[in-house]
Amino acid sequence: METTKPSFQDVLEFVRLFRRKNKLQREIQDVEKKIRDNQKRVLLLDNLSDYIKPGMSVEAIQGIIASMKGDYEDRVDDYIIKNAELSKERRDISKKLKAMGEMKNGEAK
């Protein structure tokens, strides 16, 4: 079988399609994040309405809100710590892969 060399226009089309695919992937992830965020807001309001009962004082409602806020702030802190740990592991793996690649290149020479 004979392979034909792609023309310049074919290469441009490939690059254009690849960029479009990546842009669509980023947009899909962005929309999915917005969906998750709004679903969380709906759940938060549902939870809040479960706690608030008729005849409660403003102070009691504010106490519930403050408690929920504290819980969410703690979760954010936990996620920040987890993200830092994952990033450190990713960097360590990248260093190992780079070292392995350099060892392989050294053997090939």
From Swiss-Prot:
Changing residue 15 to L: Fails to form clusters and presents a diffused pattern throughout the cytoplasm. Disulfide bonds: none annotated. Changing residue 20 to P: Fails to form clusters and presents a diffused pattern throughout the cytoplasm. Shows a reduced swimming ability, is completely impaired in swarming on semi-solid agar and has a dramatically reduced ability to form biofilms. It holds the Pfam family DUF496. The modification Phosphotyrosine is found at residues 72, 79. Changing residue 72 to D/E: Does not localize to the cell poles. Changing residue 95 to E: Does not affect cluster formation. Changing residue 51 to F: Localizes to the cell pole. Phosphorylated on Tyr-72. Phosphorylation on Tyr-72 is important for activity and polar localization of PtsI. Phosphorylation on Tyr-79 might be required for polar localization of Hfq. InterPro entries: DUF496 (IPR007458), UPF0265 (IPR053375). It is found in: Cytoplasm. Its main location: cytoplasm. Residues 14-41 form a coiled coil. Keywords: Coiled coil, Cytoplasm, Phosphoprotein, Stress response. Regulated via phosphorylation. Phosphorylation of TmaR on Tyr-72 is required for the release of PtsI from the poles and for its activity. Only phosphorylated TmaR can release PtsI from the poles, since the diffuse non-phosphorylated TmaR binds to PtsI quite irreversibly. Belongs to the pole-localizer TmaR family. Overexpression of TmaR leads to the formation of chained cells, suggesting that the cells cannot complete division. Overexpressed TmaR forms filaments. HAMAP family: Pole_loc_TmaR (MF_00683). Interacts directly with the PTS EI component PtsI. Binding is reversible as long as TmaR can get phosphorylated. Pole-localizer protein involved in the regulation of several cellular processes. Regulated processes include sugar metabolism, cell motility and small RNA-mediated regulation. TmaR controls the subcellular localization and the activity of PtsI, the general PTS system enzyme I (EI), by polar sequestration and release of PtsI. Polar sequestration of PtsI restricts its activity, thus regulating sugar metabolism and enabling cell survival in mild acidic conditions. TmaR does not affect localization of the phosphocarrier protein HPr. It also plays a central role in cell motility. The two helices, which seemingly fold into a coiled-coil, and the C-terminal region are probably all necessary for TmaR condensation. This is Pole-localizer protein TmaR. The lineage of its organism: Bacteria, Pseudomonadati, Pseudomonadota, Gammaproteobacteria, Enterobacterales. The gene is tmaR.
